[in-house]
Amino acid sequence: MKWKEFIINQTKQDYLRNIIQKVNTIENHQVVYPLKKQRFRCFNFFDIEQTKVVILGQDPYHTPKMANGLCFSVDLGNNLPGSLVNIFKALEYDLQIKRTNPDLSDWAKQGVLLLNTVLTVNAHQANSHKDFGYDQLIKNAFIELKKQKHVVYLLWGKQAMSYIDLIDKDHNLILCAPHPSPLSAHRGFLTCKHFSACNDYLIKHFRTPIKW
């Protein structure tokens, strides 16, 4: 099944219809990010069976022109947010790759699910939609993923780690680290070497590694 089919099926369920309706109502008087057409963008790139890596973020960037529907990613031409700066620092420390392109869609095209735990946010109000019920969507996505083997889960931060019990630990790789936010990255994220560990695992299980 394609991830696109999954999200279409979810939008037919009451919980997600209620969330969408609530967000639409807020948009009558408040700017919401990302743009409506980008809110389920992370599900547009590949089939569920093609999922190699899951990176679980928190909520979208709440400043203008930043959130683009892929966790941690921003479009070309924007300044790099602090979290993305630290992700690139960790990548360089690990694999000596000096990445400058902030648009992570090339990762998504290789089977990396760049999923936030909350898919919308009010402008300039971090975590403003955290209690809207998106956790049900994340749980349902993880239930679908349980049918897959040899997927690498990169869980950065406590919010991402809260979903660890939904993962089949016997047939997948789980890598945990502090969130890449400037507030916490120095606690071990910058030297976690998750990118090489991820690719080593994929190669071991005869899957194509990610070109980070």
Swiss-Prot record:
Domain of life: Bacteria
Main localization of the protein described in the UniProt heading: cytoplasm
CDD domains reported in the protein's UniProt record: UDG-F1-like
Catalytic activity, EC: 3.2.2.27
The protein's name in its UniProt record: Uracil-DNA glycosylase
Family that this chain belongs to: Belongs to the uracil-DNA glycosylase (UDG) superfamily. UNG family.
Gene Ontology molecular-function annotations: uracil DNA N-glycosylase activity
Keyword DNA repair on entry: yes
Enzyme class: hydrolase
Entry function: Excises uracil residues from the DNA which can arise as a result of misincorporation of dUMP residues by DNA polymerase or due to deamination of cytosine.
Subcellular location: Cytoplasm
Catalytic residues as annotated in Swiss-Prot or TrEMBL: 59 (proton acceptor)
Disulfide pairings: none
Substrates-to-products reaction catalysed: Hydrolyzes single-stranded DNA or mismatched double-stranded DNA and polynucleotides, releasing free uracil
Pfam families associated with the record: UDG
InterPro entries: UDG_fam1, Ura-DNA_Glyclase_AS, Uracil-DNA_glycosylase-like, Uracil-DNA_glycosylase-like_sf
A GO cellular-component term linked to this record: cytoplasm
Keyword Repeat: no
A biological-process GO annotation: base-excision repair, AP site formation via deaminated base removal
Keywords: Cytoplasm, DNA damage, DNA repair, Hydrolase
Gene3D superfamilies: Uracil-DNA glycosylase-like domain
